Amino acid sequence: MSESGNTTSMPGCGRMCALRSTWSKRAFLVACKDGALTSDGRCPQYGCGALVSITKGVQQPKKTASAKVVKCLCWVQPARWCEKHSKGPASPNGSVTTKRSNSARAAPAPLPYKKQTCDVVVTVGPLELVYPALVSEELPTPVAATPTKVEEVPIPELPLWLAPAWMVEQPYAATPEVLCLTQREEFALLKKRLTRKGKLLQRRATHARFEARAALARVRAATQRKVEEVTALVIKGRRILAAHQLLRELEEVAPLSQAQEQLVASSCAAAAARQEECASFLRRAKAWRKSISATPPVAFATAVASKVVSATMPWAHLGLSLGGLLAVPTLDGTLGAKQWNAKTIATWVLKPVVSCVQSVHAKVRDWLHSQPEVGVTNTKVPLVLPEVCLGVLSPPSLSEEIVDNPQETSQSGIWHPEMGVRNIYVFHDDSWETSPEEDENYTYTFSRQCGIPYLLVEGRGAEERKNTILGWDFSLHNDGEFEFLPSPEEGYTKELVTPVALEEEDKYSTASSCGFFSLDDVSSAITIQCPGLLSADADVHFFDGPGYRCSSRPRDFRPPVVRGCDYESRVKASIQRKIENPLQERFITVLREKRKKNKKKEFHSFSACFAFKRKQIQWPPTPNEMVNEWEEYCIAQAWLPFEVVVTDEIEDVTPLYPGGRDYNCNSQLLFPLAPLSTVYCDDSCFHPNDGWTTDGNGKHFRLSPQFVLPDVPIPIVHRVTRQLPQFLYDLGIGDLTCNSGYQAENLQEEIQERMEDRSEEKPVPSLDTLISKLSKRSTKVKGAGENRYADRHSLTEKAIFHQPGALSRMRSGKEKTIVAANHNSDQISVRMAECGKPVFTPLPRMSDEMLRKFLEKGLGSTSTVALDIGIQSHIPQGMPTVAFVNVMDTRIEDPLYSSLCGSYIDLGRDRAKTLCLPLVNFPMSKLAEDVDDVLNGLMLCTHFQDSTKFGVGKPAFQYGTLEFQEFKPSAYSDFSRVRDNWDAIAKQQNTPNDRILAGFSVLGAVSQAYNQALPVFKSVELVAPPKRKPVVATFQNPTTLGRSNTTRSFRMPTMDLPRSTGRDAPIPIVHRRNNNDVHGFDEATPARFSTCDSGLVADTTLAFAKMYQCKKDAKAGHVLATIDIQECVFEDNRRVALDWLAHGLASFKYDLQLTVDSNPFVGVTLGITVDAFDRLLPQISDEVIAVPLAFQLPTYLFPISKKGTFTQTIDFAAIAGYNFFPHVAAFGRPKIIVYIVSDNDLPASDTWMCLVELHMTRLESSTLACSPTLVLPQAFGGDLPLDLWRGPYTFPLGGGTKRLSTSLDIGTSTTTVSGWRTVSFPAAYALFLQGHGGSLVGEVVHTGSAAVSCALHLCISFGGAPPTLEEALVFPGFRLPSGEGKFHIKVQTPYGRLSTLTPDCALYVYLAGGPIAVAPMSVPYQFCIHLERLVDDGAPPRTIGLIREFNWATINNFKSDDITFAIPARLSDLVLTCGDVTMSTNPLALLIGSCGFFRGNLTVVLEWATFLKAGDKEGTVQLTTCRGMINNVKGVRNAIQKKVVNLSLVGSVSRYLNVGDFTGFAQSGGQVGYDEIFLEFSTNKAKQIRYLNINVELDENFELYGRTIIPLKNTAPAFASTSASAPNES
């Protein structure tokens, strides 16, 4: 402000700038309002923006002499800015800067002020500024004043500790300098403090959460430790109980029969005598040797040996021929191996045995030749062929006589008895001076080298049988464990490889001595395997003996050297064989480990599954538990009882010694009571020659599992990451799943369901202690079945989706796949509904806001991968209530495919949960219909089955859903995070190929299959796409407007618009997004034969039109027209005929239109019957057909009393099951028969006409067959389709008849008035059901005159006297007030269902009112009943549909012995002259006769019974599979397969056949003139056959096509028949 107070302006942007003018305050406001200045007082010119300064004049103070100049203005500004009192000027932010010069800063203008006479305190923020008074107001000192006397009062002194706080002098504390902050700085400090406070609160909350989690983890760990302790106790208890149970079962004794006891007693006596004889012979031999020790040597004579005819061993009757080991031609060098079963013993077992035997013979011969005093017969050991070793030769029959006299061998005049397989070689040698104990060293025994197969029966005998091998293993002096390989070929050089080198290489695997042996170089294998036997020294070793006393010869531990060969290929082949049989490899590995521990070789370890041979052992029983193997091995000898070894059919075997003593023998497996890992038997109880031992329980044989291994099948168990038990007695207890059932009856089952199996840690003291500990534990256990805590977090995204890796994160941002787990619903209630009625509730997939966000991100589709549904039942626990919850796709109209996956939920278990995989994708767009699909595309359908009568409409349960979704940006996105392996999702569930993966309280599941068969893609007609724009009109010479003189208005000239403006051409739209052009509101096909678009559209679908006439007094059954479908189309050669010729084999659909003038009084009803296989034409005589016979086929009724034009759509593909070819018939000529159903109530005045039109609405090229009508074995779906008509029935005027009935024996034949019996396809189909319950659905059609009317009441009654109308009104029924209409009646019987073969249950029709007619009328009320179907009410019907084998025919009373006849493979009737044929009448036979054609596979089984006696071997039967014509005169045929059996020994023969000719299908009558497959039966003793039954066994998916009838003569009724033309009247 200036001193003068005038308004000045700062220089502006130029001379015209507004800032150069003078502004007053008012003028300034006006300028801002008018826009001359901006609102903030700046120049509005571009590039200027100068600010206007307005100064205001103030009143100057008057100048007085006493006015003083202000010396300092420090009080006006902060002290730090003062130039006088501060060291230097400071900036507002507090930083000291350099001192400013006075010139740089203008002096502030002095302000007027008053004299300050007091101190002024100014508070600025936290500061208090005190300004002292500028003018003193002290009073002047009085001049003559007398000083007053002042009395000083002494102040009492207080100690410091008694003084108050305000009296205590406080030291002065230097207060730091307080800075004056601006508002921005204060706000910044405040924000900083708030931020620090918020972070502090967050850290505290985080620490609190961490501490809570740590505490929870500690609690869980403690709980888990307790659970594991209890689990260990439970497992120990289970094992103890299982072991005790197993021992109790093993201790059970199976009683022996008398014949078995006699055989055991006689065998024991024979063995004792044999042992005594052996001991006597040894004593004589030793005595003789001592007597001749001093005599000179005597030369040997020629050795004479005789074959042992029958050994004295207890197994002699089994057909084994055991001989000695002398080198004579009569020697059985195989030791009975030629009688073995080749299917049981492997080749590699027999080859070394035979080679060892031959080598021993050679060694004995060489040793005898080395003795000069010993003479040896010059004989050669016969070579044993492999065919003999493998048991190709048939075993001999059972010995009738048992020879107990041992044969003797003469050598040097001394006879030596030959006892069993033991041969003692005595040599005449002076140097032989040994002790009697050394006799056994020169005894070669092979009793432990031959494995003998037997049928063993476990001690529990009645439970099951097991196949194993009783035998003895090798005991060779060899410590090396490797595989023997043959010599290399000539010219092949390679580095020598030793077994030690093989073991050092990782790619090779060594085998034990019981591994595979080479078949090409047996001698080299024996050389390495038996080095002691083939050595040149005289120290002969033995193979068997007590204690394995082989200390006479030191063992050679040097690794044997094998000649070089192609080890790489040989060893790899050996490894491959072991991989193919891992069970054998595992046994070899265990055996190798046991041998390293210097265990006895005969004490081989064997797995428990070998001893029991059981695929499934469960204790306690659990669902879906199967034991695959046990890795705990028994280190003990197992002994088998003698009577088990012999045979299980012991009653048919002659005892060795009749009348022998009774010997009580135990028939059980002997297991030691001590732990199996520490107890094993000694050799002292085993006799090396006999191979058996005696104890208090009987005689037992030692068991070796060595030969069992190669042939034991390995059971395959389908498990998903399943950990099986690793101990022996844990029989079938594995990890629990949420599918485990809840059974509270047994505490052990509850323990098993709640606890997981773990390894044994601590023993359990007693079962009472275990129960008491379990009663104190928590009720919520991880993984439990009933009390499982199923919250929304039980399944995580990691279990469903892959986590993206580093490479996935580096992908382009455009290709991103999002996954989410949305908890969409939580408390959706489902209310109880009636049985059979569905309840639809939503399954929301996401919210509208979530969908909007996904659309903004550019996502294009969403997939529902997994759906976790948790259910909280409101039904009281334990109640029998089941709900079927089904996830359905609302976009699919067919309920069969709309149902994705469903589960049967037990609502009496409080909680339930199911995890399913819908695997459905929805598009995401902004269209309204697509948005609805995304949000509500899935729906939950619930059906209830309640026996408690829970209130309908009451909430039954609540459910919540957790949905795992995957979102993709586009259809081109190949990146998916869904796990490909569903096992990772299923985890411990055993359903890798099912959409229902988990669940508890779930009784069962139903889901769509992943791999469903694809349908046949039918032919389509390709058309060009529609135009996107309408027709564009162009103007060549446009009209121009001339300029008018006036501009006020002008007139448009007349315009002659052309007619072809294109307005008639519609704008093309896409109707339903799939169809062709749409003209107007109707679809139209462009004209094919027209040259101009005239707008006239002809009816191109008309295929046939013809006028027929009817007599005025036509009766029921009169045939008006018989239309041949394949010929009528070509009568006029319309467009339909040409299209059919172009398509060839085609599928079509007709609209049949009948035009008759409507007349309500005549009372004529027309019937139309479709005969697709030409079965009714032979039954039409004199243009009359039996109406009940026509009612068995698809029929439609048209009463002319209602209207004059009738239209009915007929789908021939659905009725006939096949498609048609023009002119030529395939399986039949389809016909449409039009006839009169009921008589005229009133005769017409004259003949009347009827127009029949056929419009072909569909014509498509197709294959021969359509969908099958029925597939066997048939899985009944619940509804039984009938489509049968009954009637016509009449109620006469006057109320004479008040009740009519028709029986519901649907499966019976129908007897017509012409004496024919007919069986329809629905009746034959009903024969597969013994009974059916539910409701009957049908319709009553009025067929008479409209002048007569009445009211009807319908009900169903079972057995007893027919109910009256008053009683029927109490039953569940249906009222028809107009006398016609549809009805739905519940079937009530004492058994819950009705029989399809007996007339006990009937449908009763009562006259509820009427009939009423006008006075001249005297006709009755006529009607027909249409039985549509039987609807199941939930109870499963009694069915025989699972039976596959049916009898087709029986032949007896053959005329001659040599007969030959053919059996067609098309299930036709047999007409034979060689015997009497009786064709069976069963459901299969009636279905074959009542269907059009069929195909599939079957097995023809021929069984016969003869007049021959047992043992007669007469006659043969030959069954030949042929191809050709059965009735061919020349007999030209091709024999494909032949089979010949004995007539008396074999009672049946079968052959697998494919039903069908060159078309792939077959008819019972066959195709005339074409080859077919048939069986030819021939025999030369036909008169000896009493009965010959021909049975057929259907294979899976045997298909039947088409529907027709079987017209049979009424000779022998097949079932209880009813008359359809004469109903029961009362």
UniProtKB/Swiss-Prot annotation:
InterPro entries: Nepo_coat, Nepo_coat_C, Nepo_coat_N, Viral_coat. Keywords: Capsid protein, Host cell junction, Transport, Viral movement protein, Virion. It comes from Blackcurrant reversion association virus. GO terms for molecular function: structural molecule activity. Residues 92-104 have a biased composition (Polar residues). GO terms for biological process: transport of virus in host, cell to cell. This is RNA2 polyprotein. Transmembrane segments: none annotated. Virions are comprised of 60 copies of the coat protein.
